[in-house]
Regions:
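Acidic/His-rich structured neighborhood in mature extracellular/periplasmic domains
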Residues: 114-239, 243-244, 254-257, 261-271, ...
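N-terminal low-structure segments adjacent to metalloprotease catalytic domains
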Residues: 2-14, 18-171, 176, 180-189, ...
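Metalloprotease/metallohydrolase-associated module, dominated by Zn2+-dependent proteases
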Residues: 26-31, 36-80, 191-241, 257-318
Length: 318
């Protein structure tokens, strides 16, 4: 969407200045007074962007247009063309909750055929905060912040878990561009003081194919209880891919850690059919935070409970 804020503001300011001068005959200030005026402070996002950032912005813009032209990035949440049963919901839950998208401790290496792990989620309150790189325009920040806050309310409602927005939280959402990497490192070290250099290197050197990323942290004495997370969303993204990243990474940071090619309708599927959290995905989140499941459960012990939850979510008799 084209935005003309700066051009319109400059035109309006010119009219206001003209009206003031027409109302009273004011002599121009002496040359030395004019020279003493400080240069205007550039607003966020108004500086010159690097060639790399410009190239990424054009690439992701073309990518979004191509996906939409193929009927992908759906925002309808699914419908009659995407039915699923309680058994399918159970299987999708197991694949997405108990397996990892990436091998633990191996950067962005795919997890592959690893065995199932344990159920991980937040046991304590989740307080989400947002940081912007200097390359993000003020108008864009307002839109991103509104989207995040609306989505936080939805996540809290679906999970019935204490999830809220905070100025300083434990789940950090960073909208950062290529030109903000130095700033991003400082923010990461301040907000996640125990973050390793290896993790920082992974976050700051994402390949173009990785649109966004979330990293969740737990303590050694409670490895299945998340206590901090960092989500990074590229500032170069166009509107819908940007919002899609918000939906997927925040939900994954709550414990839906994997993608599955069989999950449909779902954003936890690399086929890009759906852009935003679906009703199917809401059920997964609601099941994940049901008190009948506990952090640290393995897939086998959780399966009987998950089957009951899946039937409940679809309104079926037990």
């Amino acid at each position: 969407m084209a935005r003309w804020t700066k051009r319109y503001f400059g035109w309006a300011l010119g009219l206001a200045a003209f009206a003031m001068l027409a109302a009273c005959d004011v002599a121009p200030p002496p040359p030395d007074a004019q020279a003493a005026r400080p240069a205007p402070v550039p607003q966020p996002g108004e500086g010159t962007r690097s060639l790399r950032s410009e190239q990424l912005s054009r690439y992701y813009g073309r990518l979004q247009a191509d996906l939409l032209a193929q009927g992908l990035l759906r925002t309808d949440g699914g419908g009659p063309d995407t039915p699923y049963s309680a058994e399918v919901l159970t299987q999708n839950f197991e694949q997405i909750v108990f397996f990892d998208e990436y091998a633990q401790g191996a950067g962005l290496s795919a997890a592959g055929g690893r065995s199932a792990g344990k159920l991980r989620r937040w046991n304590g309150p989740v307080r989400m905060d947002v940081s912007f790189g200097n390359s993000v325009q003020l108008s864009r920040r307002e839109e991103d912040l509104a989207s995040v806050r609306n989505y936080i309310r939805r996540l809290a409602r679906v999970t019935r878990h204490p999830i809220s927005y905070a100025n300083e939280g434990n789940f950090h959402i960073l909208f950062m561009g290529e030109d903000d990497k130095g700033e991003m490192v400082k923010i990461l070290r301040r907000k996640a003081p125990n973050i390793s250099q290896r993790t920082i290197d992974v976050i700051t050197t994402l390949p173009r194919s990785i649109h966004c990323l979330v990293v969740a942290f737990s303590s050694n004495d409670s490895p299945h209880n998340y206590t901090r997370a960092v989500a990074v969303i590229r500032a170069e993204h166009p509107d819908l891919i940007r919002l899609s990243c918000v939906h997927e990474e925040l939900a994954q940071g709550l414990g839906l850690a994997n993608d599955s090619p069989d999950a449909r309708p779902s954003i936890f599927n690399d086929d890009d059919e759906f852009a935003l959290l679906t009703s199917h995905d809401e059920k997964l989140l609601s099941m994940l935070y049901d008190p009948r499941l506990k952090s640290g459960m393995d897939a086998e012990s959780a399966r009987p409970v998950v089957r009951i939850l899946a039937r409940e979510k679809l309104g079926q008799s037990l």
